[in-house]
Amino acid sequence: MKQFQVFTAEEKLKACVPAAIIPYLRIGEEEFGASNRSLTVMFASLGVELSSAETDEGLAHIQNIVTTVQEQVYRLQGSLNKLVMDDKGSTLICLWGLSPFSHEDDAARAILTGFNIIKELTKINTWCNIGISSGECFSGVVGTAGARKEFSVLGDVANLAARIMGS
């Protein structure tokens, strides 16, 4: 007989929230550590088109890619912030330096992670372009009270990582 594991709504939602945010949720902090802080930002453009999501095989490949990237990012205590798939391609945004997972060598961790992502994605016949930048930027929740909000990073550091990825 097949057994099913039962999860609470809270447990399911935690899987959708960056690990660095969970301590703020536990104490009821509304702003989730919104601040200007030193972060390392990685943008990774993946060799996957939006049309890939139209088939079961394509969706399985996308899931495999995201799982591969997550494993590498989490291994060195980074955070997968966002996956965007649109007509311009597919991009992952990853962060290092979010409290409580902040380290003096976050930039080195991001670079090593980038190399590991490229190595692992090559094994599943997927290319990627990566851009990494470090410095001071805003990180926190953006949006309107009573409406949709999301955790984001804003500033020149994030923009530079995106430009490096695209060059």
Question: Can you say where each PLM-predicted feature lies in the sequence?
Answer:
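Catalytic core of nucleotidyl cyclases, primarily class III adenylyl/guanylyl cyclases
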Residues: S38-E49, Q77-R109, E120-D156
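Generic non-transmembrane alpha-helical segments
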Residues: N64-S79, T113-N125
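Short, well-ordered helical secondary-structure segments
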Residues: F4, E29-G33, N81, N129, ...
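Hydrophobic alpha-helical membrane-association signature
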Residues: G58-I65, R109-T113, V157-L160
